[in-house]
Amino acid sequence: MSDQVIIFDTTLRDGEQALSASLTVKEKLQIAYALERLGVDVIEAGFPVSSPGDFESVKTIAQHIKNSRICGLSRAVAKDIDAAAEALKVAEAFRIHTFISTSTVHVQDKLRRSYDDVVEMGVKAVKHARKYTDDVEFSCEDAGRTPIDNLCRMVEAAIDAGANTINIPDTVGYTVPGEFGGIVQTLFNRVPNIDKAIISVHCHDDLGMSVANSIAAVQAGARQVEGTINGIGERAGNCSLEEIAMILKTRSEYLGVHTNLKHDEIHRTSKLVSQLCNMPIQSNKAIVGANAFSHSSGIHQDGMLKNKNTYEIMTPESIGLKNQALNLTSRSGRAAVKSHMDEMGYKEDEYNLDTLYADFVKLADRKGQVFDYDLEALMHFANLRDEDDFYKLNYLSVQSGSVMATTSIKLLCGDEEKCEAAVGNGPVDALYQCIYKLTGYDIVLDKFDLTAKGEGEDGLGQADIIANYKGRKYHGTGLATDIIEASGQALLHVINSIHRADQIAEIKQKKVETV
């Protein structure tokens, strides 16, 4: 048996299901690039048949990612598999992941089929997927609650049909480590053709057991672990891949396995996912939380000063968290900014230095010192910015009292600059009234969040909104030292997305009319 554990990331598929609004194609591609840098073996980019947006995202990622295998999810249905194959065919290497429910409650109450029918459907799906690729993964949904005899039967049939990866999901996070490890061990003991496939596990965190269950499965012989960055996912989330990575690295002698991950990419990958998904990382989160390497107890601090090994089982540097000795100021040149980006591991083709430096100078003039985390935030937002944004904020002035606020803005609408002033219940409300008047969009805000992206009173603030327009949800984000400006950027992000969608719909309609 191989001692390498394959890392299968499903942040862009299972993880995204936890978000209030879908990520854009550009945001998903940024995350995919980060996962590729991290050394993830397989990236599950989406569920192509579920929507045109998901299909386009999977196709785009398949076109651009070269060093990770791209995977698309499908039900055990021919049209799903066909859609996945169509989206993935441009990839250097791809996998089709098909699944069907196998637990008694799912088979009887959801599928309303006999178990014989379910096995037949699974076999047909695997055989159909093999027409497109020799890399097929088959999942037994809700395997954790599936009678073991039925599970063994399904696994054997799927392998015979051509599946070379068999995934055993604890779909509702029901099992405990000894139990889940026992399920995997039983498969190895009872399925005669088990040596022809890699056993994978996909654990959810409803009882807080996802990481522990995954490790128990690895000890029982599983050689692929599925999960997400920061453990994001439906309900209580998924298995945290950064935790799996550092467990397998830190306890490699005991567990006897390894991964191909570049562990020093963990920190920035985690930050990127948190930022783009607008899901803050709790301070005490293992591996990537702000307090993960903090020591406040006097006894602990004394031990750390004498020998870090007294209380530190891994170093901040091992996940790419480095202390910054030199801060940047408005007097720092382009070379200094580039040097900091180089030290953080960013390549020149991952960002536009001219754009980044221009944004850096503006920020440095406002806050004095600029830190590495500021540069990262500026880079991520610059990468998301579209040059063809129709609406751009040129000027903002706020007057706020104890009761009401007045905001004046100048908004560039295409080539025309328009001015507006409004009174509102606070500066953000007044600003939004101005933008609504000038753009004419009737938008309903479902969610509004402000988070700090740096340290100190002059740190960057990020505004994230979820907006509803004509029944469709949009996610907008803005970044600035001024939270009012950041809030305006977030709303304009949404409105520009709506404007582009309207333009595309208009072009399509004209084509239909022409035909």
Curated annotation (Swiss-Prot):
UniProt cross-references to InterPro entries, sorted A to Z: 2-IPM_HCS-like (IPR050073), 2-isopropylmalate_synth_dimer (IPR013709), AIPM/Hcit_synth_CS (IPR002034), Aldolase_TIM (IPR013785), LeuA/HCS_post-cat (IPR054691), LeuA_allosteric_dom_sf (IPR036230), LeuA_bact_synth (IPR005671), PYR_CT (IPR000891)
Key word Membrane present: no
Gene Ontology CC annotation, any one: cytosol
Binding site for Mn(2+): D14, H202, H204, N238
CDD domains per the UniProt record, alphabetical: DRE_TIM_IPMS
Taxonomic superkingdom: Bacteria
Entry GO MF terms: 2-isopropylmalate synthase activity; acetyl-CoA C-acetyltransferase activity; manganese ion binding
PANTHER family per UniProt: 2-ISOPROPYLMALATE SYNTHASE 1, CHLOROPLASTIC-RELATED, HOMOCITRATE SYNTHASE-RELATED
Job of this protein: Catalyzes the condensation of the acetyl group of acetyl-CoA with 3-methyl-2-oxobutanoate (2-ketoisovalerate) to form 3-carboxy-3-hydroxy-4-methylpentanoate (2-isopropylmalate).
Subunit structure: Homodimer.
The protein's name: 2-isopropylmalate synthase
